[in-house]
Regions:
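Cyclic nucleotide-binding regulatory domains
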Residues: 297-299, 303-360, 372-374, 387
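NUDIX/MutT-family hydrolases
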Residues: 365-368
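Membrane-embedded alpha-helices and immediately adjacent juxtamembrane helical segments
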Residues: 1-311, 316-317, 323
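Proline-centered flexible-loop/turn and helix-kink motifs
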Residues: 73, 360, 380-381
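A small-molecule sensor/coupling module
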Residues: 351-352, 370-396
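Short, conserved loop/turn and helix-capping segments at secondary-structure boundaries
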Residues: 235-239, 334, 346-349, 380-384
Length: 396
């Protein structure tokens, strides 16, 4: 039980630290602003494109109205009225207007793309027109997912009714919620797959993040009536701006639910890196026992860890015992909670010396060079820690 509590605290502390480093609330606020700014041209764009694929445009309009009301409950009526007026007065729009609508809606895609880069600690430099092209491709993919979602939602009620007929003990409403949740999770996972800059993410991890976002949205949906009842007093302070204030808060919460799933994916994907980071910066008996028990290698006296000109595949962390390194005739002794072998890994060279166990026995942990380099490139505190140790080596 103590191990479970310690592990839970570790996960919570590092996940909270991630949210703080990424300025999660600022990301949510920025994305919410861009979403509000580009919502009308984006909805018009979706309506115009999907109307060409579906014979009955009223179905598209009603589905978009439902989606908009979930995001901006107090403003959805005015937004959809504006969409209706624009589309009624702009029959037969040419390619120029489609280009204008894409350009007006692209800041939302740009904001989402940058959020993914921030959360996954990636830096990709591209030219302006390349980024704009990618943003337009993202918008097209989002519109395609909207089309698939609307197409499937038309048949969800019939599917739930069929399932209820086959299995009478199942409640139709429960089955409908289940099918809707599964389809929503699949669409979110596909969107995550398209947007993520990390191409090595396992499919199961994408589904976990999508499920987390879906659960948050379901929870918000259940809390909607409570939030709306609490908002009655806002009119005292905001007057005629009350509806806008409520819609902005609700939009912010929904965006936070979406980005929460992405944060969870990035956290789980980098979990091993966080464990090794704690091993270097905050070593403890609990950490070694819970996370690194299977990683510990026991060595006897005079065993050689590496020799001159051997490949640099790992950095070594000493759990217990003493290790002596010899580089160009200079000997150095390493003890508990110290590490060695990082210079060859950093410089991408072969070993410049050898390392031998000098105590009766020693316990070490191998840190893969990819993990060490990732920590060195992404974590400022770890960079300072390594630089201080390198400075000590130079001075001595």
């Amino acid at each position: 039980m103590k191990d479970f509590i310690w592990k839970s605290k570790f996960y919570f502390a590092h996940f909270s630290q991630n949210l703080s480093q990424h300025r999660f609330l600022s990301l949510c606020a920025t994305t919410s602003f861009y979403f509000l700014f580009t919502l009308i041209p984006f909805i018009i764009l979706i309506f115009l494109i999907l109307s060409k694929w579906v014979s009955n445009s009223d179905i598209i309009f009603n589905e978009l109205q439902n989606i908009t009301s979930n995001l901006l409950p107090e403003l959805s009526g005015k937004i959809m009225l504006q969409v209706k007026k624009f589309t009624d007065n702009s029959k037969g729009l040419g390619w120029f207007w489609f280009f204008i609508l894409f350009w007006a809606a692209s800041p939302l895609a740009n904001s989402l793309r940058k959020n993914f880069l921030i959360i996954f600690n990636k830096k990709i430099k591209r030219k302006f027109y390349v980024n704009k092209f990618i943003d337009i491709v993202i918008l097209l993919l989002v519109i395609f997912l909207f089309f698939i979602y609307i197409f499937i939602s038309k048949y969800l009620v019939d599917l739930a009714g069929l399932f209820h007929t086959l299995i009478p003990i199942s409640e139709k409403s429960v089955v409908l919620i289940l099918f809707s949740s599964i389809s929503l999770i699949m669409f979110i996972a596909i969107f995550f797959k398209i947007m993520t800059p990390e191409k090595k993410l396992p499919q199961s991890l994408l589904l976990v993040g999508a499920a987390a976002s879906c659960i948050v949205w379901i929870f918000l949906h259940e809390m909607f009536d409570l939030i709306m009842s609490m908002s009655q007093s806002y009119g005292i302070f905001y007057g005629s701006m009350r509806n806008l204030f409520i819609s902005l808060i609700w939009l912010f919460l929904n965006v936070a639910g979406f980005l929460f799933g992405i944060e969870l994916i990035a956290f789980i994907f980098n979990l091993e890196v966080y464990k090794f980071r704690s091993l270097f910066l905050h070593p403890s008996k609990s950490l070694l026992k819970i996370f690194f028990h299977s990683h510990i290698i026991r060595l006897q006296k005079k065993e050689v860890l590496f020799s001159y000109d051997s490949p640099s595949t790992s950095v070594y962390f000493i759990v217990d015992g003493q290790i002596k390194t010899t580089v160009h005739g200079n000997e150095r002794l390493f003890h508990n909670n110290q590490y060695f072998g990082e210079l060859s890994v950093i410089n991408n060279t072969k070993r410049l010396g050898e390392a031998v166990v000098v105590s009766d026995w020693a316990k070490i942990i191998k840190i893969p060079n990819s993990t060490f380099k990732k920590l060195l490139s992404e974590d400022l505190e770890f960079q300072n820690y390594v630089l201080r140790n390198l400075n000590k080596i130079i001075i001595n």
